[in-house]
């Protein structure tokens, strides 16, 4: 089949299809003239004269494309009548909405408020006993919607208890979340959470609201409770500070008592002599010590007595009359370098509890070669100080001494 034959065949098919469509449209228009559609009004112009009278051009000239006849199809004609139909629906819908919004919602609210009123009047005596003490503290807006029935002036109105009993009875489940939140706001309770949480607060939340009020009223008589703990801690610290200040005024306690040669064994000896002078001042301070102050005291003892073990420091901490020299305030540097923390390096090994042995601290024999200054000299690259007289400790060292000059050079580096 050639290309010309295929194109000719397609033209014939198209012309036949057009002729069939035009014939159907003509027959439909003829039926509309004989039996007019009730939707079409009589004032519309006639559709028939717009069509040609003869059918010959539709049937016998299939190849010619005629202009589309000017007529309105039946599915387009109701558009002129659509405004009337839409007006009917527009008039009916607002009526339904108005009646629903104006009349329907007040019915369950009026019923739910009238029924608990009857229940409250039936319950009677338990109502005033529950709310008798709290009526004077209720806010005024809560009292306005409650009186629904007029009462004689001589009789006190029982309307507030039924209104509050309504919120404590069966009708709690019927209330919406917004109404529950509104009632919780009136009672001063939190309004966040699910409906079950709100119902639990409504059932058992009103009496706890009155419990913290006596605390607020009684709080001006005493100290306010948020500031009570810091004041107590400050007072305990002030009382605890009497002990180091009293120890600083003692003349018989020399700084040489800290040296490893004499060892910390002689340090408890002046304690019985000065014990009666310290008992009235350090007694309340030691009784009021907290965990934080105990830790600070242990750190201070570890800094002042590097040759003593941790067990000895903790045991001496229980005794409040143990004499200790005060912390030198002019010592160059922070105490974090000297504190026996496991994370610190270098200098922390000087004050660790594993270096001095308990035999060394209890006997006046010459000191162990692994002493604090030996470690410092080993770190700084100097010769060991095992031979020779025992030098004083870090806190009693003389800055002009040539043997301890390397120590201060080493300690100045981190700062």
Swiss-Prot record:
Places the protein is found: Nucleus
Residues in SAP domain copies: 172-206
Source organism superkingdom: Eukaryota
Segments of this protein annotated with the region Disordered: 28-56, 70-415
GO molecular function annotations of the record: transcription coregulator activity
Positions with biased composition (Acidic residues): 312-322
Low complexity biased stretches: 41-53, 274-290, 343-365, 394-408
Tissue: Expressed in skeletal muscle, brain, placenta and spleen.
Motif MEF2-binding in this chain: 12-28
Assembly description: Interacts with MEF2C.
Function: Transcriptional coactivator. Stimulates the transcriptional activity of MEF2C. Stimulates MYOD1 activity in part via MEF2, resulting in an enhancement of skeletal muscle differentiation.
Protein name: MEF2-activating motif and SAP domain-containing transcriptional regulator
Species the sequence originates in: Homo sapiens (Human)
Gene designation: MAMSTR
């Amino acid at each position: 089949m050639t290309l010309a034959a295929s194109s000719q065949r397609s033209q014939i098919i198209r012309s036949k299809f057009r002729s069939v469509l035009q014939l159907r449209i003509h027959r439909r228009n003829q039926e509309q003239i004989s039996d007019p559609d009730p939707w079409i009004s009589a004032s519309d112009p006639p559709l028939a004269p717009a069509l040609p009278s003869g059918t010959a051009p539709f049937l016998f000239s299939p190849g010619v494309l005629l202009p589309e006849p000017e007529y309105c199809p039946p599915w387009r004609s109701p558009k002129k009548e659509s405004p009337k139909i839409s007006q009917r629906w527009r008039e009916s819908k607002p009526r339904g909405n108005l009646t629903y919004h104006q009349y329907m919602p007040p019915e369950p609210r009026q019923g739910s408020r009238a029924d608990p009123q009857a229940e409250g009047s039936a319950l009677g005596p338990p109502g005033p006993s529950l709310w008798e003490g709290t009526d004077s503290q209720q806010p005024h807006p809560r009292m306005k919607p409650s009186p629904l029935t007029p009462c004689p002036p001589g009789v006190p109105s029982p309307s507030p208890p039924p209104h509050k009993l309504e919120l404590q009875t069966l009708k709690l489940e019927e209330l919406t979340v917004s109404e529950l939140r509104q009632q919780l706001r009136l009672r001063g309770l939190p309004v966040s959470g699910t409906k079950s949480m709100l119902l639990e607060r409504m059932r058992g939340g009103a009496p706890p609201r009155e419990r913290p009020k006596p605390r607020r009223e009684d709080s001006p008589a005493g100290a306010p409770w948020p500031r009570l703990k810091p004041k107590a801690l400050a007072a305990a610290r002030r009382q605890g500070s009497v002990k180091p200040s009293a120890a600083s005024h003692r003349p018989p306690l020399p700084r040489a008592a800290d040296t490893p040669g004499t060892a910390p064994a002689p340090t408890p000896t002046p304690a019985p002599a000065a014990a009666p002078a310290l008992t009235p001042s350090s007694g309340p301070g030691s009784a009021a010590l907290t965990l934080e102050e105990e830790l600070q005291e242990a750190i201070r003892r570890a800094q002042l007595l590097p040759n003593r073990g941790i067990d000895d420091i903790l045991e001496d901490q229980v005794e409040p009359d143990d004499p200790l020299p005060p912390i030198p305030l002019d010592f160059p540097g922070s105490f974090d370098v000297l504190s026996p923390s496991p994370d610190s390096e270098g200098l922390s090994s000087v004050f660790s509890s594993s270096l001095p042995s308990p035999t060394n601290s209890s006997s006046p024999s010459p000191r162990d070669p692994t002493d604090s200054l030996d470690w410092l000299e080993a770190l700084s690259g100097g010769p060991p100080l095992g031979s020779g007289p025992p030098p004083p400790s870090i806190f009693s060292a003389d800055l002009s001494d040539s043997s301890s000059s390397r120590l201060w050079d080493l300690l100045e580096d981190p700062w």
